Design a protein with these regions (language model features):
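Short polybasic amphipathic segments
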Residues: 56-63, 117-122
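A structural signal for short, hydrophobic beta-strand segments that form beta-sheets
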Residues: 77, 90-93, 151-158
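Post-signal peptide N-terminal segment of mature Sec-exported envelope proteins
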Residues: 29-52
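Bacterial signal peptide processing site
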Residues: 21-25
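Mature extracytoplasmic domains of secretory-pathway proteins
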Residues: 79-121
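Sec-dependent bacterial lipoprotein signal peptides
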Residues: 1-19
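C-terminal partner/receptor-binding element of secreted or periplasmic proteins
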Residues: 114-116, 127-160
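Short acidic, Pro/Gly- and aromatic-enriched capping/linker segments at domain boundaries
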Residues: 58-84
Length: 160
């Protein structure tokens, strides 16, 4: 059997061509943060003096997706509340009537309820499963996805 130079080159290039065309994905190595590189900053919540003590509670609608039943609960700001017949507890940490974000600072521009938001934590069987915000005007923004319940900020109660 006599091979020509062209035949020999073809035989050598075919495996290279096939290997080059097959799907091959490289795993990128996770790079550690560079020395001196800043870590992602946590947001800081600042309740202005003009807002402190002006609001006493928020009203949170809890909808049971299985029964399609909605119940509204009043939860005092700075307190926690266990939803009856569940292992869920809601903590309301802060209320900002006119929520704004300035860099990493979350605050209220005024005491007027123009963009109401409640900072909450939800625990199930003692384990925190959500830490975030409920927005009255934008209920689906950053909404917590629980398999059975949904949570919505529906109202807020001023201090006397």
């Amino acid at each position: 059997m006599k091979l020509t130079v062209k035949g020999l080159i073809s035989l050598l290039l075919v495996p290279l061509f096939l290997a080059g065309c097959s799907k091959h994905e490289e795993q990128k190595a996770i790079q550690p943060a560079a020395h001196g590189q800043a870590a992602k900053k946590q947001a800081t919540v600042v309740v202005p003096a003009s807002v402190q003590g002006k609001w006493k509670a928020v009203k949170i609608a809890v909808t049971d997706k299985e029964s399609n039943k909605e119940t509204i609960y009043n939860v005092a700001i700075g307190s926690s509340f266990t939803i009856p017949a569940t292992s869920l507890t809601i903590n309301v940490d802060n209320f900002l009537p006119n929520f704004i974000m300035e860099g990493t600072t979350l605050t209220s521009q005024t005491n007027e309820p123009k963009n109401p938001a409640a900072q909450i934590r939800i625990r199930e069987k003692g384990n925190e499963i959500f830490r975030g915000w409920l927005f009255s005007l934008y209920p689906t923004t950053h909404a917590f996805q629980h398999p059975r319940f949904s949570f919505t900020l529906v109202d807020f109660i001023p201090a006397s």
